[in-house]
Structures are given as C-alpha cells and as structure tokens.
UniProtKB/Swiss-Prot annotation:
InterPro entries: L-lactate/malate_DH (IPR001557), Lactate/malate_DH_C (IPR022383), Lactate/malate_DH_N (IPR001236), Lactate_DH/Glyco_Ohase_4_C (IPR015955), NAD(P)-bd_dom_sf (IPR036291). Substrate binds at R84, R90, N122, R153. NADP(+) binds at G7, S8, T9, G10, R11, V12, G13, N97, V120, T121, N122. The active site is at H177 (proton acceptor). This is Malate dehydrogenase.
Amino acid sequence: MKVSIIGSTGRVGRATALCLAEEEAVKTLHLISRKESLEQNLGEVLDMSDALAAKGVSVKLENSADIENVYGSRIVVITAGVPRTADMDRDDLAFKNGRIVADYARQIARFAPDSIILVVTNPVDVMTYVALRYSGFHPSRVFGLGNHLDSLRLKNYMARHFNVHVSEVHTRVIGQHGPYMVPLISSTSIGGIPIEHYARRDYFSGYKKFDLKKTIDKVIHAGSNIISRKGATEYGPAFAISNIVTTILNDERRILTVSTLMEGEIDGIRDVCLGVPVKLGKNGIEGVVPVLMDRDEREAFREAANHVRDSTRRVMEFLDEELPL
C-alpha cells in the first residue's frame, strides 16, 4: 500500500520515512517536501535506497514537492510545520502551524479523498481538529499521534525502574499531548499486579519506593528534555508513528492512544480532540475504548479537555478569517 509523508525533510519526517520503508506492508513511500527542499528530499531518497539495499528491503521510494502526488495513498502522515523549541509553549505553535495543516488537509481531501490522515504536527490535539475540519473527512479517518508516544515513555520509565521487560508494563496516558496529559496510574499494572502494590512494598531487594510524581514529570517534560539537548525528537515519534501506520495497514485492531474527536464517549466530553484509547483497523478508528479513572484522573481529564478546547477555539477563529471553510 502507498503511504505519503508531508514534511519529509524535517527530522521527524526523515526518521519516520526510514521506519516505514522497512515495513513489509508499505509498498510505496512518497516523500513530499517544500520546493526549496526538493534537492534535499531527493538526497534523502537516494541515501535511504542504499540503506534499504543493505537490509534487503524492496520498497518503491518517490519524492516530490507536489501535494497532488498523495493520490492513491492509503495513509497520509503530516509532519510539516514550524518545529517546537525547548522553551516554546505548544500553544505558541498553534497559530503558526494551524494555517499549514489547514492548507494541507484541504489538498489531501482533494487529491486523496479516500485516505486516512495521521497528524503529527504540534500542538497535535489542536492540529488534529484543524485537519478534521478542513479535510471534511469522517473523524474515523483523521487522528493525531496524541498520547501514544507519551504512553510508550511511561511504560519505558516504569520498566526501567522496576527492572522488568517493557511488555510487562500495562499503562496509558490520555488527555493532551503536553502539560495537561493524564497518566492513568490507577489502572496501571506490572505483570498483572497493580502498580500501587509495587509502590508501597519492597517486592524485590534493592527496590526504592516508586516516585509517582517524579515519573509523571519525566513523561511531561520528556520532549523538552530531548529538544534542549539535541534540537529535536526524532526516533521516539518515528517509531510511534510506525506503530500506528502498520496497525492500520495490517488491520491489527490494536488499542492505541491517539488524538481523536470526542463525541461524548467519555464523561460526555464533545467537540475537542484528545488522546484516548481507540481500536485501530484498516479503515481507521473503529471505536473509542472506555477508560477507568479515579476521581483525580477524571478531574484532570476534564481540565485537559477545557484547555485544549479553548486553544482550539482561538485557532479556529483565526483560521476562519484567514482560510474560511
């Protein structure tokens, strides 16, 4: 199947391209850049071709600066936009990237009307809403990276702390991809044992008491910590994107936490895109999965909804003047 990446010369776009090129389900990978980056884009394709030859992978690689070449794509990944700096609030990006995402969403709807749109551009929850409205697609076919990467980070930190394989950690982060994210600690388990038991007891010699607040802070600030050191996050987002894309192409029906339009499925929250667990299959989102939350988590989730909704409203008011629907 064909997958297109818009913004393929950016650091996340490049890393994502290499991840997806190695996936058997991806038969054609089309990389779209700005015209001024077309030579760099071609260089990426040539370099990637050599790498794939060494791996014995055969995939058709294409590159262009023409958005109409998304034609025939099963999935279009939007990574284009102004990158976030370490000291930049995600909301500061919204007005800059909103217009970019809105324009691409319109063109995707024109040239690839049957495709699924995966939004990566930050702030991803707001940009997912923008892409949804400007594409006119059904919400099942427009969603964002959301809290999938945040959930993976939390799993990773817990696995390292408790010295277990990451697959033994079952946890999830919902809400905003940003400071209003909500780790669902109340329903987290390791090897089938609720995390609160690990936190309160010394199950194995040498274990320190689990510092929940410190762990949550690490997840919230993970992106900023990486950006401050190397300028951008690349590999984490790329592999998380690959998880989502291959889940769809292979019709795996996995439950992943992506940013999707809320329509009352959880606590009656509506008209805002938030990270929640969904079942993903060949046609996109097959349904939102209910979540168990304690009182504090529920309150935090509602706070996240209010914050993201307010940010989204301001961006949509701006875009209504710049790019009327």
